[in-house]
Design a protein with these regions (language model features):
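Catalytic alpha-helical scaffold of carbohydrate-active enzymes acting on polysaccharides/glycoconjugates
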Residues: 1-128, 133-177, 200-222, 230-264
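Surface-exposed cleft-lining segments at the edges of enzyme active sites
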Residues: 126, 188-199, 225-227
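Glycine-rich, positively charged active-site loop/lid region within alpha/beta enzyme cores that binds
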Residues: 171-195
Length: 264
């Protein structure tokens, strides 16, 4: 089923953030629970990066979708209230940041329900889901349907939104090329050969991909993390890039939920 774009629009653009804070580091390696230096990278996202992100979006008059683990929402309620107060959408991103492929069906259900409850305490209905690690189990879509979710943003098999035929869940495809993590993620406990990319280089990559998707009438799903994109040089790059996107009158800049409703 094709996207029903607003009049005069030829493609869609979604600004999304995975507000993982410390949870992504705990999921990567449980031993990180005893490594405050490692965890502080996630804390930066909550304490500094998110504020810079929200200020940038407010300055540009843009709305975004924040996919947030439930445990992060519980740990940082003030930040969650600010996200909601500014009119942004909340999306489900697990309770912890554990891949569904590592869970039994009962454990995955518990993650789904606890995460949903943690987000909805901030007064907003949560209908969108993004899997931690962009991976799903054989049970994921059955559970999403059973518990009132309307869309997923976890798969990489298209540049246009589509309906999962067996479940009637809208998929808003993602791709690593439009994620900030491959360019900016770095940990001293990981691969020291990984190179941190310059913000200028990443903007060039994102511009080229956006231009290509726009020409094909697709969805550009930009995926970022406050702890990575929220560094001073990168937030300046993000403002430049979003200003460039806004300069194209035929681009529909919307939240993930708005795009999903245009498909279903």
């Amino acid at each position: 089923m094709p996207m029903k774009l607003p009049a005069g629009k030829t493609c869609a653009f979604v600004i999304s953030f995975d507000f993982d804070a410390e949870e992504v580091w705990l999921a990567e390696n449980p031993e990180n629970a005893d490594r405050p230096g490692v965890l502080s990278q996630g804390s930066y996202g909550a304490k500094v990066g998110l504020g810079l992100v929200l200020d940038t979006l407010d300055h540009l008059g843009l709305q975004a979708t924040f996919f947030t683990p439930g445990r992060v929402a519980e740990r940082y309620p003030e930040q969650m209230r600010e996200i909601v107060a500014l009119g942004h959408e909340l999306g489900h991103h697990g309770y912890t940041h554990t891949s569904p492929t590592k869970l039994t069906k009962a454990e995955e259900l518990e993650e789904l329900l606890k995460g949903k409850a943690a987000l909805e305490q901030f007064g907003t209905q949560v209908t969108g889901y993004r899997s931690p690690s962009w991976e799903v189990s054989p049970n994921t879509f059955d559970l999403l349907v059973a518990h009132g979710f309307h869309y997923s943003s976890s798969m990489m098999d298209d540049i246009k939104p589509y309906l999962h035929p067996a479940h009637k869940i809208v998929e808003l495809p993602v791709q690593w090329i439009l994620d900030d993590a491959p360019y900016f993620w770095f940990s001293s406990g990981g691969d020291w050969n990984r190179t941190i990319r310059s913000a200028k280089d990443v903007q060039e990559i994102w511009r080229e991909e956006f231009i290509g998707i726009r020409a094909l009438g697709g969805l550009t799903m930009l995926t970022m993390h406050p702890q990575f994109i929220g560094r001073p040089s990168r937030i300046a790059m993000l403002e430049e890039f979003l200003t460039f996107v806004k300069s194209h009158d035929d681009v529909w800049i919307a939240t993930a939920g708005e795009v999903a409703r245009a498909v279903k």
